[in-house]
């Protein structure tokens, strides 16, 4: 049997010590887990990619889950890190202990449409409150030595609460497991959940759609479409589908009106037409000035584990 490696306090990484001590000073208990928010440098669909080649995986047992940042209209990741049993905690430092914020999420109504519910729309729990100004001195931004996947931040209490509210409804439709899904952005704000669902259903298996931002937004801080979106109200949607890659190829940088007009079932000629770059162009709007859709895979299973998705217990995990 392979011996469990021993870590001595003197040999522990300074960054590991800093992470744990900073987390403890903000009310985290490492034995119960430390929540991180990860902003990736490129689109990531698989939880395993978040944990690969990352310094935290040496010291922590990691669980990664997708997270929608409503403020930035951006997909990020929330990671729960529990210190490995064989890793000692760093010696206590004279850092004043601060209690974690008890910010409670604000419940707001958003639109959704799921096939098993017929034409019924449900209210979703979601928050869109403005977080406090980012404490840049606290951000863990050492991409070359910490992780090559993105920038890691210790998650604030309101971010963890928002994540749990988002995922509570998402996992409920798939018996407590994360379903395969894609994030469809910049859908015209006048498109209802039922209309969106029925349109996408014509082109592939779609189990449901869920509105991700609670009100139409005019701009995006993280894409080159800022000028285009400044005059157009759009919304972002989560599309629950077992074939996210197929729908992503169909929808990304396409026009909503064209998607609605495509024949049913989708012909190969239509598919080739809509996916050709020379037809959709490289700009962020069509000739009429309407915004193009952006589609990104939100969550997929690892190839080695296609039949079961990671389970999450949003009630018991966390601090």
UniProtKB/Swiss-Prot annotation:
Originating organism: Schizosaccharomyces pombe (strain 972 / ATCC 24843) (Fission yeast)
GO cellular component, one term: mitochondrial matrix
Protein name as annotated: Uncharacterized protein PB1E7.11c
Molecular function GO labels: translation activator activity
GO biological process, one term: mitochondrial translational initiation
Keywords from the UniProt entry: Mitochondrion
Compartments in which it is found: Mitochondrion
Top-level division of the source organism's lineage: Eukaryota
């Amino acid at each position: 049997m392979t011996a469990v490696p021993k870590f001595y306090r003197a040999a522990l990484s300074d960054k590991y010590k800093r992470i744990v001590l900073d987390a403890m000073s903000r009310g985290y208990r490492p034995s119960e887990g430390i929540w991180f928010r990860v902003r990736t440098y490129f689109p990531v669909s698989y939880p395993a990619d978040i944990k690969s080649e990352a310094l935290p995986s040496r010291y922590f047992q990691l669980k990664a889950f997708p997270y929608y940042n409503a403020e930035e209209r951006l997909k990020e990741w929330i990671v729960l890190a529990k210190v490995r049993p064989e890793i000692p905690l760093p010696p206590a430092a004279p850092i004043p202990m601060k209690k974690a914020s008890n910010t409670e999420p604000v419940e707001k109504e958003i639109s959704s449409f799921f096939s098993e519910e017929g034409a019924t729309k449900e209210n979703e729990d979601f928050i869109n409150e403005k977080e406090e100004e980012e404490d840049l001195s606290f951000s863990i931004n050492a991409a070359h030595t910490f992780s090559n996947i993105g920038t890691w931040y210790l998650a604030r209490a309101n971010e963890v609460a928002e994540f749990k509210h988002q995922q509570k409804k998402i996992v409920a439709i798939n018996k407590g497991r994360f379903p395969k899904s894609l994030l469809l952005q910049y859908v015209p704000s006048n498109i209802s959940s039922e209309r969106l669902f029925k349109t996408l259903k014509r082109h592939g298996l779609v189990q449901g759609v869920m509105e991700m931002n609670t009100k139409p937004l005019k701009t995006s801080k993280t894409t080159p479409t800022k000028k285009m979106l400044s005059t157009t109200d759009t919304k972002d949607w989560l599309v629950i589908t077992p074939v996210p890659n197929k729908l992503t190829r169909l929808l990304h940088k396409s026009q909503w009106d064209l998607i609605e007009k495509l024949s049913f079932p989708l012909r190969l000629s239509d598919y080739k037409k809509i996916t050709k770059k020379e037809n959709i162009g490289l700009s962020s709007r069509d000739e009429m000035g309407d915004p193009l859709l952006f589609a990104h895979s939100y969550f997929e299973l690892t190839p080695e584990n296609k039949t079961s998705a990671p389970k999450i217990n949003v009630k018991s995990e966390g601090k």
